[in-house]
């Protein structure tokens, strides 16, 4: 008789995805982030569900309902800070996951890569709307500034902004709809993750060498299940250390002041994981230009498969491309730092230089260096 694991219509899907899945024998810890992102998503949905049980999406009570969660609900503080810091962990892993994809040339799986970029957009939208919900100063002004950017769209812009707001300013209608979208999007993200995995399992995983690994596969379970569990353990240690010792380390103190439309905070800035994009947005003096640069700074990821000009897939054996890759990482860290600084000299100039370097590295330097490496290897 056939094993239930292999014959049951539902269980066999799980079996082919997580148990009997043939995986390359040499994938490193950089391949752990996919499963960590899955755990993060589950954790966010779970903690978010419990928060939604006590939260009220109304401008008069939203702030005090969050206070009530932290003070009066059993372990409410724990759930709230796990959700807030869980989002930070989510983005750390997302950026590592994308960085791994760029370094090892995983973007050549175009279907998987493109759905991944769409996933990034969906997660960013979810995080942005979630940040608005506590209705603190930074929530309100962040929502006002970012939604206002859409007014830069020619002809339909101003109407579109008022349509999103549900009025003539960020108010009760905006908060209610943001809560609704923030609740539904993670489930849409979960569906997209399944499509992401479906496309990945059509081709199988990439590996550090970038070569075909069909001749050397091992079963996912127990080898990579145990490896993933170790990764999850490290993640939980980091997350719980953050939550227990410095829960507000990554947050903004301004968000502990209830939203006040009559008083603007001294420095309006998003959460740390959006600062690099915010810096690119601010580095262009024109509103529409800034918005286009902001969108393109993420959308540029979709160009990686087209711009790939090397005869090798991975950067493992390409020292010059490796240098550029780490230059890009350093560049993004500089942009993140600039995004959190006030708009004054010398930060404006540094931000503009870093923004230009970001696009120049991806669009010009990386493809031309890859071509040069081909020449050096007489290909």
UniProtKB/Swiss-Prot annotation:
Disulfide bonding pattern of the chain: none
One Pfam family of this chain: Cytochrom_B_C
Name by which UniProt lists this protein: Cytochrome b
GO BP of this protein: mitochondrial electron transport, ubiquinol to cytochrome c
Main location: mitochondrion
Gene Ontology CC: mitochondrial inner membrane; respiratory chain complex III
Cofactor(s) the record lists: heme b
Subcellular location: Mitochondrion inner membrane
Database matches in CDD domains: cytochrome_b_C, Cytochrome_b_N
Top-rank taxon, per record: Eukaryota
Organism of this sequence: Ctenomys mendocinus
Keyword Coiled coil among UniProt keywords: no
Membrane topology: Multi-pass membrane protein
Similarity-based family: Belongs to the cytochrome b family.
Note: Heme 1 (or BL or b562) is low-potential and absorbs at about 562 nm, and heme 2 (or BH or b566) is high-potential and absorbs at about 566 nm.
């Amino acid at each position: 008789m056939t094993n239930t694991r292999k014959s049951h219509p539902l269980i066999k899907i799980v079996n082919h995805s997580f148990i009997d899945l043939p995986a390359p024998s040499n994938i490193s810890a950089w391949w752990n982030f996919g499963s960590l992102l899955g755990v993060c998503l589950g954790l966010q949905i779970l903690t978010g569900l419990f928060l939604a049980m006590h939260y009220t999406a109304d401008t008069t009570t939203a702030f005090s309902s969050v206070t009530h969660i932290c003070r009066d609900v059993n372990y409410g503080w724990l759930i709230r800070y796990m959700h807030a810091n869980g989002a930070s962990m989510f983005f750390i892993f997302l950026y590592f996951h994308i960085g791994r994809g760029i370094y090892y040339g995983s973007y050549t799986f175009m279907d998987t890569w493109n759905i991944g970029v769409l996933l990034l957009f969906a997660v960013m939208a979810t995080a942005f709307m979630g940040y608005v919900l506590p209705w603190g100063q930074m929530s309100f002004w962040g929502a006002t500034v970012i939604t206002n950017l859409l007014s830069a769209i020619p002809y339909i812009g101003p109407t579109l902004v008022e349509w999103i707001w549900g009025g003539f300013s960020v108010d009760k209608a905006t908060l209610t709809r943001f809560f609704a979208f923030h609740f539904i999007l993670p489930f849409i993200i979960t569906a997209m993750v399944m499509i992401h995995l479906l496309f990945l399992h059509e081709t199988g995983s990439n590996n550090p060498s970038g070569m075909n690994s069909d001749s050397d596969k091992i079963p996912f379970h127990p080898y990579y299940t145990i490896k993933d569990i170790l990764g999850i353990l490290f993640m939980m240690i980091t997350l719980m250390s953050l939550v227990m010792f410095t829960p507000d380390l990554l947050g903004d103190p301004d968000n502990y002041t209830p939203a006040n439309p009559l008083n603007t905070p001294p420095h309006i800035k998003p959460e740390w994981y959006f600062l690099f994009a915010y810096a690119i947005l601010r580095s262009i003096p024109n509103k529409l230009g800034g918005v286009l640069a902001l969108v393109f700074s993420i959308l540029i990821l979709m160009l990686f498969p087209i711009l790939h000009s090397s005869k090798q897939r991975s950067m493992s054996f390409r020292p010059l491309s490796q240098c550029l890759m780490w230059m890009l990482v350093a560049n993004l860290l500089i942009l993140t730092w600039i995004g959190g600084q006030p708009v004054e000299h010398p930060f404006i100039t540094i931000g503009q230089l870093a923004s230009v370097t970001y696009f120049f590295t991806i669009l010009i330097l990386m493809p031309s260096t890859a071509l040069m490496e081909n020449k050096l290897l007489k290909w």
